[in-house]
Amino acid sequence: ETYDVNVMGSVKVLEAARKCRSLRAIISVTTDKCYENREWAWGYRENEAMGGYDPYSSSKGCVELVTSAYRRSFMQDQGVGLASARAGNVIGGGDWAEDRLIPDILKAFEKNEPVVIRNPNSIRPWQHVLEPLSGYLVLAQKLYENPEQYAEGWNFGPFDGDAKPVGWILDQMTSLWPGQKWILDVDMQPHEAGYLKLDISKAKAKLAWQPTWCLESTLKRIVHWHQVWLENRDIQAECLNEIGEYMRDMKHANH
């Protein structure tokens, strides 16, 4: 099912896009897990080998290969810019997905239960959801204006200093929600990469894009968003306010 949805689903979307003559720019979003993880200390660059230990990760590497094939076989001849984007571990308010760190933490907080964690030393490139979205918009504009120059793979991750261990995230979150704690799950767990970072040098140099919010600020915003939701306040207004703050901070950071 994972391969059917991620790989063949992407093929079907790209096949439909190939037949749509009005399209000028397409971004295929995969994940940082598309890279062959070597557990090294450096961030992965866009020209690193695709791979993946598990079906999910390898399926995303496959999507990158599919995207590259469609770009070279079809899209470039039609003058369509087809790029791929690889974001880090995206977090933010309103995420209720299963088996994800931040939602699991908030669910435990709501129940006043300790957070059970399996890999506190795993390092991930955490970033607020608005960060890669802003990068995708910049990339889409560049693709539209100059498809030949920008039709390739791009990383949109945090600054190196915000690639933090899971345990650090838990310590920050429990400090923001007094009375909470976390405990280690000692049972056998599925394989999971211990160290994963993205090199965003290319996006900074060629797109003039860079992250806006630090991880500490992002975690504070997530807790605030969730508390607004728990109090049944206007969550749409909160979302719009957060987007406005991000745009202002991004403009200020780029000047």
List each language-model region with its residue ranges:
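C-terminal substrate-binding subdomain of Rossmann-fold SDR/epimerase-dehydratase oxidoreductases
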Residues: 109-255
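Catalytic helix-loop patch of NAD(P)-dependent Rossmann-fold dehydrogenases
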Residues: 1-15, 19-25, 34-90, 95-97
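Phosphate-coordinating loops and pocket residues in cytosolic domains that bind phosphorylated ligands
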Residues: 4, 28, 46, 134, ...
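Amphipathic alpha-helical segments in well-structured domains
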Residues: 6, 10, 98-102, 136, ...
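Solvent-exposed, non-membrane alpha-helical residues enriched in polar/charged side chains
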Residues: 14, 68, 106-107, 220
